């Protein structure tokens, strides 16, 4: 959810998390950083736009990921859970075995192709029956009202969703799968990065590679050969 600050003439509250409450209300979780609010006073909510955009990138990427998984693995794939924040995304899905490196690469390539295709992301409210007729993917076991929100990404992905998304897939920048593992019988989990989080990951990896090469007294390009030679000497 969103983070940011809530301010008034008498205090400031730092919002670290937002949660859904019963009755359609939203709870703001955080700490008072200045003063104290007074009952009945007017407050101003200031959303951290950078956090919202990064979270939206990861959320939109999960939609592309689900469609790519169904294309590569089959229509038996269904969402079994997900988590997104500004730093990363996690997607749980139904599948009967570990994915091969080739399958993971195909999925990653498909997602990146749709990012580069700059697909418009369009949201529309319609009846549940209309959404089903449009082919929109829905969460298994989820209860929906008569009116639902449909998120469409070009002709590639159509899902029922009430979350925040980018306006165009090109804003996701890039997508990288970090891991794929089983979390329960018949349920797999993929963790991945997009946007600024992915850039930071590549920068950290590059630093580690250069550091390892320096320790081995070689260049990053020759590091594997150097390690193989060292292992051969040990035998």
Language-model-derived ranges and their functions:
Residues 1-235:
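A glycine- and charged-residue-rich anion-binding loop/surface
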């Amino acid at each position: 959810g969103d983070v940011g600050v809530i301010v008034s003439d008498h205090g400031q509250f730092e919002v670290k998390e937002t949660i859904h409450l019963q009755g359609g209300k939203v709870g703001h979780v955080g700490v008072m950083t200045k003063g104290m609010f007074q009952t009945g006073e007017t407050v101003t909510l200031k959303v951290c736009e950078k956090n919202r955009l990064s979270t939206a990138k990861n959320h939109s990427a999960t939609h592309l990921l689900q469609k790519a998984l169904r294309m590569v693995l089959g229509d038996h794939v269904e969402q079994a859970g997900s988590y997104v924040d500004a730093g990363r995304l996690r997607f749980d899905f139904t599948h009967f075995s570990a994915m091969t490196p080739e399958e993971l690469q195909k999925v990653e390539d498909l997602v990146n192709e749709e990012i580069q295709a700059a697909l418009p992301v369009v949201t529309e409210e319609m009846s549940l029956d209309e959404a089903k007729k449009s082919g929109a993917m829905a969460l298994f076991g989820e209860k929906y009202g008569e009116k639902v929100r449909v998120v469409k990404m070009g002709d590639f992905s159509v899902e029922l969703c009430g979350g925040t998304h980018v306006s165009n897939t090109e804003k996701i920048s890039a997508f990288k799968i970090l891991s794929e593992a089983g979390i329960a019988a018949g349920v797999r989990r993929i963790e991945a990065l997009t946007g600024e989080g992915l850039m930071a990951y590549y920068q950290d990896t590059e630093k580690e590679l250069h550091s390892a090469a320096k320790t081995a007294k070689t260049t990053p390009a020759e590091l594997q050969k150097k390690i193989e030679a060292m292992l051969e000497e040990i035998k």
